[in-house]
Amino acid sequence: MSDENKQPHPMSQRFRGFLPVVVDVETAGFNPERDALLEIAAVMLTMDEDGWLRRGETHVQQIDPFEGANLEQSALDFTGIDPWNPEREAVPEREGLSEIFSPIRKAVKEHDCKRAVLVGHNATFDHNFVFAAALRADIKRNPFHPFSTFDTATLAGLAYGHTVLAQACKLAGIPFSNKEAHSAAYDAEKTADLFCGIVNRWRELGGFPPPPIEIAEEPQE
């Protein structure tokens, strides 16, 4: 098939030309400019020819704390991450983010999208850490939209009446292990399953494509 006759990927028609990519970060605190980024996972999403959203491959990087980074002990206790454990095989922020961003840029092109949009559970947290790290690492080609995100905490509150990831997953019929939680890969994959489930359920219910709606005219005074 020639490029002229090639049909655009269905994903490019679903989210205004954006490719949703699910991201979870594990950190040494809550301040993206001061506290260390320790782990990042990105889960790719795709859409089949029938328009159903599916989870794809997962990319994970362990990250070395940047020079001068703050490490809150309470955050380390919560995640169970030892930043100095050599078995982590951690890499500097620039190398780790480059390894995460590269397949995302490739997927954006393959899905005929114009850029990626970050999906996360409480997405602002992940978005802020990704962008702060990219700025420190002087990475110019950040594939993510600079401010738009899809937040599964908000979507789950609408769909299931619960904003906690573990509880929302259980209500959605997605198995969730508290023992495996707080690993970037595990949390990102569960968030991806939750996001796909909500988007697909909305489609099943007839919410997308949106039905024609007659726009009422403003009353004339």
Curated annotation (Swiss-Prot):
Disulfide bonds: none annotated. The active site is at H182. The keyword Transit peptide does not apply. The record marks F30, F78, F125, F147 as: Important for substrate binding and specificity. Residues 21-195 form the Exonuclease domain. Trims short 3' overhangs of a variety of RNA species, leaving a one or two nucleotide 3' overhang. Responsible for the end-turnover of tRNA: specifically removes the terminal AMP residue from uncharged tRNA (tRNA-C-C-A). Also appears to be involved in tRNA biosynthesis. This is Ribonuclease T. It comes from Marinobacter nauticus (strain ATCC 700491 / DSM 11845 / VT8) (Marinobacter aquaeolei).
